[in-house]
Amino acid sequence: MIRHRPFGSGHPYAVDTEQRSPVDPVAGEPLVLGVRTSAEVESVVLEWERDGVAEAPVALERVPRSSRGQVVDGGHLASAQARLARASGGWRVTLDDLVADERIRYRFTGDGGGRAQSTRWFETTVARWTASGVGPAVDGVDRVVAGSVHRLVRGDETLRVRFALPLAPGERVVGFGERFDTLDHRGLALDSAVFEQYKSQGAHRRTYLPMPFAHVVGGVGWGFHVRTSRRVWFDVGASTPDALVVEAETGPDGELALGLYDGDPRTVLRRFLDEVGRPEELPDWVFRLWASGNEWNTQAEVMRQAELHREHDVPLGSIVIEAWSDESTFTTWRDARAKVADGAEPRRLADFEFPEHGAWPDPKGMVDELHRRDVRLVLWQIPLIKMRPHPAGQVKADADAAIRDGVLIREEAPDGTLRPYRNRGWWFPLGLMPDLTDERAAHWWTEKRRYLVEEIGVDGFKTDGGEHAWGRELVYLDGRRGDEKNNVFPVHYAKAFGDLMRRSGKAPVTFSRAGFTGSQAHGTFWAGDENSTWEAFRWSLYAGLNAASSGIVYWGWDLAGFSGDVPTAELYLRSAAAAAFVPIMQYHSEFNHHRTPSRDRTPWNIAERSGDERVLPVFRRFAQLRERLVPYLAEEARRAVTAGEPLMRPLFFDAPHAHEAFAHPFQWMLGDALLVAPVVEEGAGSVRAWLPDGEWVDAFRGTRHTGGVVERDVPIDEAAVWIRADAVDRFAGVFV
């Protein structure tokens, strides 16, 4: 076997062994060509031509087997990612001195085992960067730096546009969607690619939910939106301190639109949301405590956990069940029995028999009982048809119907024909992917789940995944390619399930981790997979503040992390104190193969594991406080949605010129009346907080303060929260 894939897998941050890099060769830059071979191949030679003239064959060098991707924490998600990340070795060659516009034709021949094997011939043309007098189409006051526009062209096609925007001394740049590493991005470089980075997003500086939008604050006040769904790179003063350099992929015509907005952060965000879609007000119950654990995978366990919340007097608003399904169709409850049906047909509750001793003997009865307890139920989803191991039964019928009915994203086969795209990511590899950007396909997909809402009574869906569309060459049902549509897939994924909820007469509650520009209008979000560490705690708060700056209203994170061993009692309680004052308060834990001791993030398990008797009463105190805050949160969310403002608001929204707003990056306003300053360092017993101008009242102690820096000791059972003095009456009976 000898294989070369010019585009590779489409992984945005890695070069595959068998790909061409860069995919589009550029004059003056080295071009690396790689192949992967079977073990018997002993040598590989590149045959190639330049503008039809044969060049001397070049021998490839062997690439050693990589050790990257080794499993370090034993989790099933880590194992899956590691299997994909490990490279099996291959061959590569580097070509230099490429000339603009020359056509390169090449193939590879490998020898070994007594025979030669060759790939087919591949062709590409060398692109070049050239200065251009035509920049992006600007809507607003034109800030594009004169002479900064360049285009990457190949023949008559434009591949990318690069230009610069000015940065004045003292200006800060905030936003870009959900970003984990910092609040002010000046001095850094980043890009806008939807990507599933399993844990440590802040260290890798990658995100599930990017947006090519940001605020520039601290000067005259402005913001920008690169109006594209294609990938964009931002050099935010990293290379040139006084310039924000933007490089964007384009279509062949080279057109690119740029929105520039003058004004304070509220004005900038409002204008951005007017373009891309305002958030929709969701029911009050989303502000109550969300609880889940991946090992809550039976009806008995779900009800046991619900009962434990009641027994320990911890208010519970909703339960998220991840491992509820057969793990193949994601429409059928595990252990349920049903005849194999046409995969296009919506299921009905009457289709299923639920064995008395199965995992879910009466899912409808379970949901009814939860509703009687005023607890909502959210079910997990993934936008894939599982194809490994080889499908059988209902999942095979589903796959056959999806192919027959033409509802899948496709890719080009080597012979140029189109075939169903097979997931190239590490999670559910080779799965089929419905084109949820297409209304017909989205309806086809979600109707199969309608019985869960209308007959079982489910209140929402955890729309997990959404990052599985890899490759610019993918073909969507409207004919557009992956370079243009992969990023917006998760937006349509959440919309599709929100539309299902609406059709069924319920609020469009979805709980997503992936998204892009336009996600603001679709449901709630959490910050994805993270470890139980103090560093991850801080990364998650940065993520929430950047997401809020980009217009996400309903956001939370797995408080104290979900992966690895349980958090310390201190981390758990400090995280709970912070989570009580963000839009979504929820805890969750990763699958641990049901090993003991349990890694559940319930307060009673953390209390047992840590041996710290403070855990349960302190968590209870914050959960009960959260319950009393729900009316305030609902009212402030309504105002935020109407006004186009964040609910969890970084301080620069109120004081864009104040240095202190960035000197205290982990503070925020929750609505108009509460200022929150969490403890985010291990062993810290106090915080140094900054209060904007005005009168403030300590929420827990009643002491009054004027604006400025305040030092406050923070016992483990308190949070550093201040109320605007003119709003104290709104919190009568809340902080008790």
For the regions a language model picked out, list residue spans one by one.
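Flexible loop/turn segments at secondary-structure boundaries
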Residues: W222, R231-F234, E295-Q299, S325-T331, ...
